[in-house]
Amino acid sequence: MNISIISVGKIKEKFLKAAIDEYSKRLSKYCKLNIIEVADEKTPDNASLKEENIIKEKEGNLILKHIKDNSFVIALDLKGKSITSEEFSDLIENCRLTGNSTIAFVIGGSLGLSQQVLSRANYKLSFSKMTFPHQLFRVMLLEQVYRAFRILCREPYHK
């Protein structure tokens, strides 16, 4: 199975890079992982709604360039569906069983995802109603993908 994580912005903190590297290494047993970072647009202080939408559109266009036609796209969105880790593993397994061997997870920047990206998504997923820094969220997503594969393989994992 091919898993892509397409996210806005670069990871700067060493501790987050270390966590991403660790989960990437762990996931190599289960899937081919591709992490793609697209440039984030600078948001001016007190940006208008119109300016925010333009920024999201620019970031969205960069994201869409990396999504393959055959990808099952899961957008990480506050308005998405909240599911358990077990349901998340079922979602990944259902993709595999229905011939979707490529899953693209999309993480937006600080303003979220553009409407074009949300429209392209096959599934909208929310981890929480809380807001997280998008750099930290990448680690959280990798952990949940790793947990999902451990669940699918009936391997022990800390609960």
Swiss-Prot record:
Where would you find this protein in the cell?
Answer: Cytoplasm
Subunit arrangement?
Homodimer.
Cysteine disulfide partners in this protein? none
Q: Which residues bind S-adenosyl-L-methionine?
A: L76, G108, F127, S128, K129, M130, T131, F132
Q: Which species does this protein come from? A: Clostridium botulinum (strain Hall / ATCC 3502 / NCTC 13319 / Type A)
Name the chemical reaction catalysed here.
pseudouridine(1915) in 23S rRNA + S-adenosyl-L-methionine = N(3)-methylpseudouridine(1915) in 23S rRNA + S-adenosyl-L-homocysteine + H(+)
- Please give the superkingdom of this protein's source: Bacteria
Query: What is an example of a GO molecular function annotated in this UniProt entry?
Result: rRNA (pseudouridine-N3-)-methyltransferase activity
Name under which the protein is recorded: Ribosomal RNA large subunit methyltransferase H
Q: Which SUPFAM superfamilies match?
A: alpha/beta knot
Keywords linked to the UniProt accession? Cytoplasm, Methyltransferase, rRNA processing, S-adenosyl-L-methionine, Transferase
Q: What is the E.C. number? A: 2.1.1.177
What is the recorded function of this protein according to its Swiss-Prot or TrEMBL entry?
Specifically methylates the pseudouridine at position 1915 (m3Psi1915) in 23S rRNA.
* Cited HAMAP family: 23SrRNA_methyltr_H
Annotated GO CC locations: cytoplasm
The family this protein is said to belong to: Belongs to the RNA methyltransferase RlmH family.
Q: Cite the source lineage.
A: Bacteria, Bacillati, Bacillota, Clostridia, Eubacteriales
- What's a Pfam family this protein contains? SPOUT_MTase
